[in-house]
Amino acid sequence: MSASVAAPPPALSRKAEFKAAKAELLARFQTATNVTPLMHALSRATDDALRRLWHECGLPATLALVAVGGFGRGELSPHSDVDILVLLPDAHARELDERIERFIGMAWDLGLEIGSSVRTVDQCIEEASQDVTVQTSLLEARRIVGSTALFERFMLRYREALDARAFFQAKVLEMRQRHAKFQDTPYSLEPNVKESPGGLRDLQTILWIARAAGFGSSWRELDTRGLITDREARELRRNEGFLKTLRARLHVIAGRRQDILVFDLQTQAAESFGYRPTPAKRASEQLMRRYYWAAKAVTQLATILIQNIEAQLFPATSGVTRVLSPGRFVEKQGMLEIAADDVFERHPDAILEAFLLYEATRGVKGLSARTLRALYNSRDVMNNAWRRDPRNRHTFMQILQQPEGITHAFRLMNQTSVLGRYLLNFRRIVGQMQHDLYHVYTVDQHILMVLRNIRRFAVAEHAHEYPFCSQLIVNFERPWVLYVAALFHDIAKGRGGDHSALGMTDARRFCREHGIEGGDAALVVWLVQHHLTMSQVAQKQDTSDPEVIKRFADLVGNERRLTALYLLTVADIRGTSPKVWNTWKGKLLEDLYRATLAVLGGAQPDAHSELKTRQEEALALLRLETVPPDAHRALWDQLDVGYFLRHDAADIAWQTRVLYRHVAADTAIVRARPSPVGDALQVLVYVKDRSDLFAGICAYFDRNGLSVLDARVNTTRHGYALDNFIVTQTERDVQYRDIANLVEQQLAARLAESAPLPEPSKGRLSRLSRTFPITPRVDLRADERGQYYILSVSANDRPGLLYSIARVLAEHRVGVHAARINTLGERVEDVFMLDGTGLSDNRLQIQVETELLRAIAV
């Protein structure tokens, strides 16, 4: 008897068939260099599947199934939504509703991510008039199956109702609002390939506006119309192709709709494009640089196109308002306009002049589309001869030396690629991401952010932000020297080697070529060479040690250098990430500045005189607090010189006022107050010392979501620990005054317990840290005097890290004398001063280092 195999149910067969067809296309998406034909093929396969379902559901010929949005355009990324409109005649039988619901349900069953609407023609027109998003999706409507007459009637009504001018204004406003959500920059760490500035949505917006205005629906048609040039059309197609391919590969790699280029996928996406890591750059950094360049080009060309379309839709009624540079530039409706299309070809020196005029001319708010286009198409003019032209070098220095508008001018020069063509080494770092868990901007954006920060110090309306910096820069002669240093301080990033040394060479050449001589040139070069030094000294060294201050003062040499380095350092740290700067770092830097300035002014770094000064200032404060005249002696007699040097007079007075009655306390005394230096909590702990005390305090802070910024640990002569911590709450918007009492009670109770130290919790790393982990490092060495050991730790930041370190030290009975906790974005670079007892044993040193590496490993 012959066996027969039953045919699969139609639904299963249909689903398997579509799934197989889609899988074959997805496999090709992974390697295709041009995905547009595949997007069309996926759209056609989806059309076919929907037609079959339409007929199976018995939907009448009087209805129409319409593709809208990207599906209407005939382009589907691997996991894009499939947007459809079921177009109804004005009158229809109610039983059709059930069939339509069945059709949509079967489409979902097929595996399609359906976005559906069911409307009559009148309803479509009404919805479109109320919502520009609906109006946009219908702009590219395409009939799949059903009534041609109904569809054509709908399109006729739609076109009649479409107001091209109103549509233009609505879409431009929508684009600006969308850009604002992404901080108006394409240079996000995790850009949205579709929605971010310079992404696919910007290109689609231009084509929607052009289509609505009747100017065409492709780059070729816009070229024919004269809205763009052949070269611009090629650039647009090339960058659009790259962005489409990148988006499609993200979908395939993620196995779902994924438009954000998240850290987790950047390496895989880079490898799919053939990028491989080099000693200087990760594969992901190479891909991101290509993405940023594409987004930058799209932004440039979109600006030109939108202005051109606007000029066609809203013809200007007035002509030239004033001549700014005879035969070269005029102002037209607040925009800088070239006098003739070939100005830059005939006068290459006019290229930089354009930015000088933009910067220096009141009422000029930007460059016109005509000027932007001429700049874009003058790239061949910006050659070696142009860079060497003394006129251009003079103009560039004029741009740097203007009293205002410098930041805007340099940003515009970068956006138009002129800055990178004038400074070729700057061009090398445009779009270069730094996956160092510290910087959140590309190198070029970071440099311009530092320039902006220095300029901001000099602007009166921003003086309240950093009053000390503003006070210093007002009296700083020729501040443009700082701007040059800002331009070059990181210009050598990504080349391999020491970027400070390489950048110093670039800066020296720039100064020589631009007539910067003598002390100004020497200062620029010195600042680039040492731009990291002040931060490292302030955050990693014991600045209470007079020798540390003396060495730094010897390096700096004079007040002008000190002030310049301080201003550059503050601007640099603030320009890395919104998370890195805090008031505590500001205090460390300002304290170092003031201490160094005193030495440069002739003050001798003498510990005895400094101790005497601090004590006198503290006593004056205690008298104001009505503390009895000799009450401080009981406590002060138990404190060494190091205590008085590590604390300022205000802290000494506060701690003395709290403790002078409790010098021999039987129980722990814990006091907390909002930190005088900024948004943090200052915590004082006074208790009989023990080897696990520091670890126990860190355990409490860890369990309660408090991050330690600074720890100053002191042991009195009679065996008490007098420890001072600066901590912050990881949750935002906390009122430290409200939690001070709670910390005092809970921490005192915790210290009264005799329980063993708990196991450290290995908190979760951020996605950035998981994707780009740094190699943990531990360095343990004796200090120069042999009195203490210095422990340096660098690792990915995570909850519980400090306690993990403290616990290892406690287990080996290694005392912590001081700690500088330096959090740089997603990484930490902590420095501990340890008691030297026992650490002279090399075997113990190796054991401690090994266990620390194990404790901080991710």
Swiss-Prot record:
Ranges where the record places region Uridylyltransferase: 1-324
Cited InterPro entries: ACT-like_dom_sf, ACT_dom, HD/PDEase_dom, HD_domain, NT_sf, PII_UdlTrfase/GS_AdlTrfase, Polymerase_NTP_transf_dom, UTase/UR
Cofactors, names only: Mg(2+)
Annotated catalysed reactions: [protein-PII]-L-tyrosine + UTP = [protein-PII]-uridylyl-L-tyrosine + diphosphate; [protein-PII]-uridylyl-L-tyrosine + H2O = [protein-PII]-L-tyrosine + UMP + H(+)
Ranges of residues in domain HD: 443-565
Keyword Lipid metabolism attached: no
CDD domains: ACT_ACR-UUR-like_2 (cd04899), ACT_UUR-like_1 (cd04900), HDc (cd00077), NT_GlnE_GlnD_like (cd05401)
Ranges in coiled-coil conformation: none
Listed EC numbers: 2.7.7.59, 3.1.4.-
Ranges where the record places region Uridylyl-removing: 325-681
Disulfide linkage: none
Notes on how activity is controlled: Uridylyltransferase (UTase) activity is inhibited by glutamine, while glutamine activates uridylyl-removing (UR) activity.
Annotated ranges, domain ACT: 682-761, 790-858
Domain notes: Has four distinct domains: an N-terminal nucleotidyltransferase (NT) domain responsible for UTase activity, a central HD domain that encodes UR activity, and two C-terminal ACT domains that seem to have a role in glutamine sensing.
Sequence similarity: Belongs to the GlnD family.
The protein's role, per its UniProt record: Modifies, by uridylylation and deuridylylation, the PII regulatory proteins (GlnB and homologs), in response to the nitrogen status of the cell that GlnD senses through the glutamine level. Under low glutamine levels, catalyzes the conversion of the PII proteins and UTP to PII-UMP and PPi, while under higher glutamine levels, GlnD hydrolyzes PII-UMP to PII and UMP (deuridylylation). Thus, controls uridylylation state and activity of the PII proteins, and plays an important role in the regulation of nitrogen assimilation and metabolism.
Protein's name in the database: Bifunctional uridylyltransferase/uridylyl-removing enzyme
Name of the gene: glnD
